[in-house]
Amino acid sequence: MYGVLAHYYSFISSPSVMVNFKHHNAVQLLCARTRDGTAGWERLTHHASYHANYGAYAVLMATSQRKSLVLHRYSAVTAVALQLMPVEMLRRLDQSDWVRGAWIVSETFPTSDPKGFWSDDDSPMGGSED
């Protein structure tokens, strides 16, 4: 999409272990239910305790009492800053009631994993909460 290439992966951690958890697409990653308003998106950004921008690479960490989610994003958050998003999409964003950061992620993440991003050893939904 307009030169924006977004790769994603996350780590789910518990007090004893941090494991790689593969998500099939951005919707699975951000929200287990359909886009039914702001509530499903606010949970991710509301609990964000760390957010850093490194050029075209960004990190978001969402935490709760039980687990942490570390999300590495390439060109997702910086798409607006680098003016990589088309004007009509920016207009929709400005008129939206949705959480700005989550909206950008949902619009710029790929719907499937890039070829070769995961090794052959990775399972489609590997990992555990323990």
Swiss-Prot record:
Record's keyword terms, sorted: Host-virus interaction, Inhibition of host innate immune response by virus, Inhibition of host interferon signaling pathway by virus, Inhibition of host STAT2 by virus, Interferon antiviral system evasion, Viral immunoevasion
Give GO terms for biological process. symbiont-mediated suppression of host innate immune response; symbiont-mediated suppression of host JAK-STAT cascade via inhibition of STAT2 activity; symbiont-mediated suppression of host type I interferon-mediated signaling pathway
A molecular-function term among this protein's GO annotations: ubiquitin-like ligase-substrate adaptor activity
| Gene Ontology cellular component terms for the protein in this record | host cell nucleus
Keyword Amino-acid biosynthesis included in the entry's annotation: no
Record carries keyword Secreted: no
Q: Can you state the subunit structure given in the record?
A: Interacts with host DDB1; this interaction promotes STAT2 degradation.
The function of this protein is: Plays a role in the inhibition of host innate immunity by exploiting host DDB1-cullin RING ubiquitin ligases (CRLs). Mechanistically, recruits host DDB1 via a DCAF-like interaction motif to antagonize IFN signaling by STAT2 degradation.
Name-wise, this protein is Protein UL145
Q: Name the source organism.
A: Human cytomegalovirus (strain Merlin)
